[in-house]
Amino acid sequence: MSEHQSARTERIATDLAGVLTPLDLVLEDLAVMPAGKRRLVRVLVDRTLPEGGDPTDVIPPLDLDHVAEVTRVISDRLDETDAMGEQAYVLEVSSPGTDRPLTLPRHFRRNVGRLVEVTAPEQQPVTGRITRADEEGFTLTVTGPKGATTEQSYRYDDDVRGAVQIEWGRSSDSEGDDH
């Protein structure tokens, strides 16, 4: 990406963050790339984390209606500001999917209640359910072969990475039942 494109993307990101904040959303990622005679604008948004919230609370994901509303807001803003210039563009707005790696504290916090595989330097990957996540680290509840559970704590300073595991057959109602 050229310096001009990078500066434009940064300006767009700053502008979009301004319209997302009142909607209690945060800009997770923005990419502007050529797509034939047009440009493709990919925007990832997610809910703003509640200040001082309970680190064991499950945070509901964005639903399709919310994403559709946000898409209209972003499209209107891009058109108002003429940020994309004269060239046509295609706008894609979504929330981070399960394939997006968990690398920042807010990623782990948003996935309380979900099954994840955690990788820490010089350790074997561990799969368990995030039961708590705060500013310092998170707790993973791991179920052993005989059904016994243990809790393992990780600090973000330890350069941990996570990946959400898809659970077939687990109803969304069972996630966070006791919250």
Cite the ranges covered by each PLM segment.
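Short Lys/Arg-rich amphipathic alpha-helical segments
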Residues: M1-H179
